[in-house]
Amino acid sequence: MDLIYQNPTDLSHEEAIERVKQELKARNFGVLWEFDMTKKLAEHDLDLGAKFVVLEVCNPQKAHQVLSKDIAVGYFLPCKMAVYEKDGQVFVGTIKPSFLMGQLPGLDMPEIAAEVEEILQATVDALAG
């Protein structure tokens, strides 16, 4: 099973970030934090040579549901999405919740992981170009 689900998009980096936010909102998810990795590295005089932004996203009801079953799931929350450039192409992607949850022994929540994964993948697919 692959860890990452991603697609290229025809949108600019900035447009893709805004569109991800819109798509997530339409699916009852919110962006808790937007981390500009390129900017952070530049503060340390390190040039990444491309734009890379991590979005931490969450649906409070889903988070409560999984945390109530096993607090250790908190290591994987909030869900991560990324918008980045590589070789002149913008990509949008996410880490698959089903893969992450499969890493905790005894954790049995495939339905919840599948629901969240479907939403995140639909968000990525909405930007595919």
Give the residues covered by each predicted segment:
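Well-ordered alpha/beta subsegment
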Residues: Q103-G129
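Compact, glycine-rich, soluble single-domain proteins
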Residues: D36-A82
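General beta-strand structural signal in soluble alpha/beta enzymes
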Residues: L32-E34
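Active-site rim loops that border cofactor/substrate pockets in soluble metabolic enzymes
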Residues: F29-G30, K40
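Terminal, regulation- and interaction-focused segments at domain boundaries
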Residues: M1-N28
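Beta-strand/loop substructures that line and gate deep hydrophobic ligand-binding cavities in soluble
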Residues: K80-G106
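Short glycine-/small-residue-rich flexible loop motifs, especially phosphate/cofactor-binding loops
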Residues: K21, T38, Q121
